[in-house]
């Protein structure tokens, strides 16, 4: 796409022309990846810059996480007009959050590719100590492609990956090039190739705020699940679980875990800092806050739906991260707690140990999710093992009977996934992979919040289940394929 190439080329030119020397005018802990890599130290600074860019509001810092939950039916809205375009599926090619996904995603791919190219050039010259950083960059490149293809392409298992995905970009792109959308299968093949190449290079040591071998395996496992390769996915997940490198939170410390950074379950989380990635009044925490609680601009945007609350047990410890909404007040029953405070640390705005309670890290991969995905995979061949994995998480409700090989099923795993991962940006993507219908609690409060863009119940055949390509992209390259319906 010409638009992509123009964006990528301008980023390179501006970054290079604005810097007299590598670290002359940039922070010492991060830099734009289009500057030259001359040492291992340079490569690390470049990776820092890439990780920081991925925490922007148009990616993991807010919108990508919102997308995965507001479209999944376990959240509803109090009233219309407050950041609700994703909930309504009001996507349009002329503008909106999907434009930010596209631009930021390809910006990050540019940086990842420049890091990879620079490191590989140094390795050819004989520089050592670069394997881990190369493995990190390859893993992140795979993750970005994975995110983009899920936003703009149909699920792999919907048609075997035959439909249009996104342009695979694995090298700096010349401004005259016009890369077209590759088939979903080709995108997934590249993702698997990057993750497989990275696995023997990347360190198994924990590195807070960065990907390691276990993050690589978790991403690989999820990718394989999208390809219906459950045996390979289970192998990847078992590599994590059996290593015992991470441990599940006990029921007693699950709630408090949200007040800490890089806990025992955290396989990969983006670090958010008050002076760098903190979005303040525009943060995820404020989006999920009760009205005017976390900030005077908090409108009580998104609340847990009755559908989610109905699958929660009365004594489930996960109620501890929820609190009352602005309509009912604190005297309401505990099972009316609608507001999720994971991104504020606690209902008392504890944060996660920084000077501002809105600069809370984004937990991308937790061990709890790995257990639940492993349970789904094991269910295909070993129900007893699947029950063991599921029980490790479901015991967070002390009243829930243990699952057995005779009682476990796909819905049991799916509903536990919903309980555990509310507001973590996962649900809608999983629903599309599993070919599930999504029902929305529209008009929950009687204030006319029914969507004009979708029905009350949708599935993955609905054209708005994937995003449109932006009109600027279409105008710059008329040959690019627009998703049907837009």
Annotated model-derived regions:
Residues 82-152, 182-183, 200-204, 355-362, ...:
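Conserved, well-structured interaction surfaces
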Residues 33-34, 61-78, 153-162, 204, ...:
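Short, surface-exposed recognition loops and adjoining beta-strand edges that mediate ligand/DNA contacts
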Residues 19-66, 288-293, 298-301, 311-314, ...:
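Membrane-proximal, proline-rich intrinsically disordered regions
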Residues 188, 230, 383-384:
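TPR-repeat structural position
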Residues 3, 9, 15-41, 191, ...:
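Bacterial Sec-dependent N-terminal signal peptides
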Residues 228, 234-238, 242-355, 360, ...:
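Extended ligand-binding clefts on enzyme/binding-domain cores
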């Amino acid at each position: 796409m010409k638009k992509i190439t123009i964006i990528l080329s301008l980023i390179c030119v501006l970054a290079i022309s604005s810097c007299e020397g590598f670290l002359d005018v940039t922070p010492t802990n991060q830099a734009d990846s289009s500057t030259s890599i001359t040492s291992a130290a340079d490569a690390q600074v470049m990776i820092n810059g890439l990780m920081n860019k991925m925490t922007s509001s148009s990616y993991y810092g807010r919108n990508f996480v919102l997308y995965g939950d507001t479209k999944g039916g376990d959240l509803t809205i109090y009233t219309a007009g407050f950041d609700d375009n994703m909930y309504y599926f009001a996507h349009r090619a002329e503008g909106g959050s999907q434009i930010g996904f596209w631009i930021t995603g390809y910006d990050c791919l540019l940086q990842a590719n420049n890091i990879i190219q620079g490191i590989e050039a140094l390795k050819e010259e004989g520089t050592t100590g670069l394997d881990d950083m190369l493995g990190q960059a390859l893993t992140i490149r795979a993750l970005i492609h994975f995110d983009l293809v899920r936003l703009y392409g149909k699920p792999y298992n919907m048609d075997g990956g035959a439909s249009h995905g996104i342009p695979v970009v694995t090298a700096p792109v010349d401004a005259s090039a016009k890369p077209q959308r590759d088939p979903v299968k080709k995108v997934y093949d590249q993702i698997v190739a990057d993750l497989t190449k990275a696995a023997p290079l990347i360190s198994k040591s924990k590195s807070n705020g960065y990907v390691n071998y276990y993050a690589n395996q978790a991403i690989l496992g999820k990718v394989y699940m999208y390809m219906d390769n459950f045996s390979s996915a289970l192998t990847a997940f078992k590599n994590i679980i059996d290593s015992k490198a991470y441990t599940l939170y006990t029921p007693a410390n699950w709630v408090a875990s949200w007040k800490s950074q890089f806990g025992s379950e955290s396989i990969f989380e983006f670090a958010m800092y008050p002076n760098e990635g903190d979005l303040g009044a525009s943060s995820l925490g404020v989006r999920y806050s009760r009205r005017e609680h976390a900030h005077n601009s908090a409108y009580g945007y998104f609340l847990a739906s009755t559908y989610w609350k109905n699958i929660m047990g009365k004594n489930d410890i996960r109620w501890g991260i929820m609190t009352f909404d602005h309509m009912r007040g604190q005297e309401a029953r505990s099972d009316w707690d609608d507001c999720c405070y994971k991104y504020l640390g606690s209902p008392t705005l504890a944060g996660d140990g920084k000077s501002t309670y809105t600069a809370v890290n984004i937990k991308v991969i937790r061990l709890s999710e790995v257990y639940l995905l492993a349970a789904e995979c094991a269910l295909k061949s070993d129900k007893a093992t699947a029950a063991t994995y599921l029980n490790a998480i479901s015991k967070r409700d002390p009243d829930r009977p243990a699952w057995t090989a005779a009682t476990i099923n796909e819905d049991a795993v799916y509903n536990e996934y919903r309980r555990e991962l509310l507001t973590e940006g996962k649900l809608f993507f999983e629903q599309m992979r599993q070919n599930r219908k999504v029902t929305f609690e529209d008009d929950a409060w009687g204030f006319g919040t029914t969507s004009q863009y979708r029905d009350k119940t949708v599935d993955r055949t609905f054209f708005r289940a994937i995003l449109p390509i932006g009109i600027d992209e279409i105008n710059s390259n008329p040959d690019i394929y627009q998703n049907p319906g837009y």
